[in-house]
């Protein structure tokens, strides 16, 4: 699986925290980008593809962030957060959640990111691994938001990137599970085109002001736009 534009965009844009979960981490790109952007963060990446997890672990071990990034091979539906049964409500004091250790003890994350499977009704690719990575059969949107609701701290932020074809369905599923859309960024490839993908941030509570804007990746000369260059400057040589 190659490094994709969607992963680069989300890894450069998403809000971070002290304990970050990357759902569908693939080869570890977004996990590593979040670790680089947030030097104090502990990052956990989960994916159900064993080969992708193996490659992600190799990439993590070759990075400067090996002590802060962990890769687990499992489905979101089976992931326990910290391998413990405690919940945030079971902690004796709210102050315990003010550190990465407190979040881990509670089995929750204050930032979750995902570049989720997005093909809903299209024909499946004969390459089973590519199908798994791209088709919602492996992680329906309802299951994704249910998992995020279980694992996100009360004040945490969930960020995702989805193509324009499914953005309305994605937001609708978030509402059903009680989330509020707090930030929306449409991304055009070039100025004359309509947005092909949307980056979205959700919270468990309404947050003001709501942010919505559209950005362009490439300028008229085919170079990275000022916006794209700015958000990715620490990742590109």
In which residue ranges do the predicted regions lie?
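SAM/dcSAM-binding transferase cores
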Residues: 192-237
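Conserved Class I SAM-dependent methyltransferase catalytic core
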Residues: 3, 138-195
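Mobile active-site "lid"/loop adjacent to the S-adenosyl-L-methionine
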Residues: 116-143, 147
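S-adenosyl-L-methionine
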Residues: 1-16
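Conserved SAM/SAH cofactor-binding pocket of Class I
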Residues: 12-84, 102-126
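Long, intrinsically disordered low-complexity tandem-repeat segments
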Residues: 87-100
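Residue-level signal for inorganic ion chemistry
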Residues: 10, 115, 144, 202
């Amino acid at each position: 699986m190659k490094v994709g534009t969607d992963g680069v965009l989300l890894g450069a844009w998403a809000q971070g925290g002290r304990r970050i979960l990357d759902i569908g981490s693939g080869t570890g790109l977004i996990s590593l980008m979040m670790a680089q952007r947030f030097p104090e963060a502990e990052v956990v990446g989960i994916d159900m593809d064993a080969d992708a997890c193996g490659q992600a672990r190799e990439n993590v071990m070759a990075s400067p962030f090996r002590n802060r990034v962990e890769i687990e091979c499992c489905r979101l539906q089976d992931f326990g957060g910290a391998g413990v049964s405690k919940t945030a409500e079971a902690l004796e004091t709210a102050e315990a959640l003010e550190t990465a250790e407190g979040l881990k003890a509670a089995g929750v994350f204050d930032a979750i990111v995902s570049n989720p499977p997005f093909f809903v009704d299209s024909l499946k690719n004969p390459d089973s691994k590519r199908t798994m990575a791209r088709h919602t059969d492996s992680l329906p949107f309802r299951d994704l938001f249910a998992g995020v609701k279980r694992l996100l701290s009360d004040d945490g932020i969930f960020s995702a990137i989805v193509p324009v074809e499914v953005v309305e369905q994605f937001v609708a599923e978030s509402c059903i599970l009680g989330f509020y859309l707090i930030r929306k960024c449409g991304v055009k490839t070039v100025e004359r085109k309509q947005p092909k993908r949307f980056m979205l941030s959700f919270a468990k509570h309404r947050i003001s002001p709501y942010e919505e804007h559209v950005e362009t990746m490439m300028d008229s000369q085919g170079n990275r736009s000022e916006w794209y260059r700015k958000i990715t400057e620490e990742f590109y040589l």
